[in-house]
Amino acid sequence: MQLSKNPIKQTRNREKNYTDDFTMKRSVIMAPESPVFFPPPLVFSPTSVKTPLSSPRSSPPKLTMVACPPRKPKETKTTGSDSETVLKRKRPPMLDLTAAPTVASWCSTTRETAEKGAEVVEAEEDGYYSVYCKRGRRGPMEDRYFAAVDRNDDGGYKNAFFGVFDGHGGSKAAEFAAMNLGNNIEAAMASARSGEDGCSMESAIREGYIKTDEDFLKEGSRGGACCVTALISKGELAVSNAGDCRAVMSRGGTAEALTSDHNPSQANELKRIEALGGYVDCCNGVWRIQGTLAVSRGIGDRYLKEWVIAEPETRTLRIKPEFEFLILASDGLWDKVTNQEAVDVVRPYCVGVENPMTLSACKKLAELSVKRGSLDDISLIIIQLQNFLP
């Protein structure tokens, strides 16, 4: 009688083959969705504004923009098992926003670095601001940011524009907003200065948000983005948002929220949505428009555009000596850290010290959010308002 092969040995062989296959599959690293992790660095001439990533279908701005080769970023890796690629940027070229009436961004990574999947991006301009972005655990990085400062030392006012853009359903809307919103706002302000209309700073910001949204919808792309921006001009600070990105200011050590989160559960937002024929319901403890989206304002979201508006809320303040610093951040931070906690963490690094370390403060805030269980992308900018006093 012929004996059959050992069934235990066969089972073990099958288990080994399955384990090998599974190991190979899970070793694939997910690359970022977009080849551009952040917008490329730009240099503006006094005669133009044209963004390289804008679609031919978008309305071209009046001025001309010349793109320069990005500087090679410095990459470092942390020691230990959880290594991460860090992109660092310091000292951008001087920007003259008076000579060139547009807002220019130098914040970027190269395509090569983005394709390698940078986990962390750091940028700073000593004495003015620091940026820190950390990719979450849910997938590709969908946040973008924008920062530009006119560092004129002729005794005149310093001008600046900052923005944090939190994408959902992909990074295209956040990337588009980062590249175009500042230019659109500046175009509206330039129009007002030329006497074409009498729009104020707030109305120029509103016009910039609406135009950015309209232009993105013409692109035919999916997804959307929440936005929070800070425009500083002639000693005035205008903070705006659409969505749940938030701006918090330290006024003598006390946290003051300068924006309100636009969620469907808010009474005024719920009333507006229902008046337009939409509905809001609760899914797993989160209120969502039409059962899908958890924010009620932002750029994009074409399939919910009837209810998700790009209309920003803006608050304008004259910068005063008691205004210490401003934090702009995505909800990856604010979902886990309260406004006052954020101010308490940052203040020892920025106030009453000879050499402020705002980048270290950014890292501490992000680490606190991650420690408390945040899985989302975290992007934040800390702006030292004392250096923009009129």
From Swiss-Prot:
Cofactor(s) needed: Mg(2+); Mn(2+)
One Gene Ontology term from the biological process aspect of the record: abscisic acid-activated signaling pathway
Signal peptide: none
GO molecular function: metal ion binding; protein serine/threonine phosphatase activity
Keyword Magnesium set for record: yes
InterPro entries: PP2C (IPR015655), PP2C_BS (IPR000222), PPM-type-like_dom_sf (IPR036457), PPM-type_phosphatase-like_dom (IPR001932)
Record-listed Mn(2+) 2 binding positions: 166, 331, 376
Keyword line: Hydrolase, Magnesium, Manganese, Metal-binding, Protein phosphatase
Cofactor note: Binds 2 magnesium or manganese ions per subunit.
Family: Belongs to the PP2C family.
Protein name (record): Probable protein phosphatase 2C 30
